[in-house]
Swiss-Prot record:
Keywords: Lectin, Repeat, Signal
UniProt entry tagged with the keyword Transit peptide: no
Family named by the database record: Belongs to the jacalin lectin family.
Name this polypeptide is given: Jacalin-related lectin 8
Gene3D superfamilies given in the database record: Jacalin-like lectin domain
GO molecular function, one term: carbohydrate binding
One Pfam short name: Jacalin
Chain segments annotated as coiled-coil in the UniProt record: none
SUPFAM superfamilies tied to this protein: Mannose-binding lectins
Gene: JAL8
Signal peptide: 1-23
Domain Jacalin-type lectin residue range list: 24-163, 165-309
Keyword check for Signal: yes
UniProt lineage: Eukaryota, Viridiplantae, Streptophyta, Embryophyta, Tracheophyta
């Protein structure tokens, strides 16, 4: 039995106008012939549908998530007598496909079996494990779309991959308040609104960009002075958050006392709050901020971020 590992054959990266990495294309592997199809790069894969029989996989179909909306992809191949199996990915819990393993018959050119692995679970092999084995994926990246070839059966399969967002640890009071998580699936940060008093940060609202639309998330209690900082998205990205945290006399809680934001153009926001206590910096070279998470109760207790890669032009 031949085994092929496809973890390195990548075409050039797909990037946006600011050099933020969108996706890379892994070349398709499998049999020859058939009509080429290409679902393109999306935000996530939501569900996999496979129809097959003893001769191999007849067709494959994917449901995707793009710009926060789920949609049904096209059927690649044809349907005949046989079995149908599905595999669901819980994208709302940030589950993502990280690799695909499979088998194809090099004589007939027909895909025989596929298995999908996510960051949370692994499917069973769908189909029959015979022929040439292959693996499709890139370490440290997630699959956000597929392409390949098909005729009366699935012939080959390739993928679009992107670097998985990195989630930072929380800074501040990590036990107080309730935990919240906006997730990493935004295009960028447009504006932040920070409410603070003489002693600590009370709340932070964030305007995210998602496919050109503003999506706002609210965290904390808006009691105090509110100031804002705007990012010139999509010409500019937020890249760094600096701040301090300390115990306050009201219950001796550990909370955030100040916040400052930096952008890809080197701009620095005003300092929100009072710089006192332990200092922290949330920044990773070559990355931009694509989402926030944190804790809040009566005060804004803690903050963390999601980083997505930027490719220098």
């Amino acid at each position: 039995m031949f085994i092929i590992y496809l973890f390195i054959f990548l075409s050039s990266a797909i990037i946006d106008s600011n050099g933020v990495a969108m996706a890379q294309k892994i070349e398709a592997i499998g049999g020859k012939g058939g009509k080429r199809w290409d679902d393109g790069a999306n935000d996530n894969v939501a569900k996999v549908y496979i129809r097959g029989d003893h001769e191999g996989i007849q067709y494959i179909k994917f449901d995707y998530v793009k710009d926060g909306q789920s949609f049904n992809g096209s059927v690649h191949g044809v349907s005949a007598d046989g079995f149908t199996q599905t595999f669901e990915i819980d994208h709302l819990q940030y589950e993502q496909i990280v690799s695909v393993e499979g088998y194809y018959d090099w004589k007939t050119g027909v895909m025989q079996a596929l298995q999908f692995k996510t960051n949370l679970k692994t499917s069973e092999f769908i189909g029959y494990q015979k022929g040439t084995k292959f693996s499709l994926g890139v370490d440290g990246k997630v699959i956000v779309g597929f392409h390949g070839s098909a005729w009366r059966s699935l012939r080959s399969l390739g993928a679009y991959v992107k670097t998985a967002p990195t989630k930072s640890e929380l800074q501040g009071g990590i036990t107080g308040g309730e935990y919240w998580d906006d997730g990493p699936n935004f295009d960028g940060v447009r504006k932040v609104y920070v409410t603070f008093t003489e002693t600590h940060i009370r709340s932070m609202n964030i305007d995210y960009d998602q496919d050109g639309q503003v999506v706002t998330r609210y965290h904390g209690m808006k009691n105090g002075e509110t100031q804002e900082f705007a990012v010139d998205f999509p010409n500019e990205y937020m890249t760094s958050v600096e701040g301090t945290y300390d115990h306050i006399s009201e219950g001796n809680y550990l909370v955030l006392t100040s916040l400052t934001f930096k952008t890809s153009k080197g701009r620095i926001s005003q300092t929100f709050g009072l710089v006192i206590g332990t200092k922290f910096v949330l920044e990773t070279k070559g990355n931009v901020i694509s989402g926030f998470h944190g804790r809040d109760g009566g005060s804004f207790d803690a903050i963390g971020v999601y980083f997505s890669p930027m490719i220098s032009s």
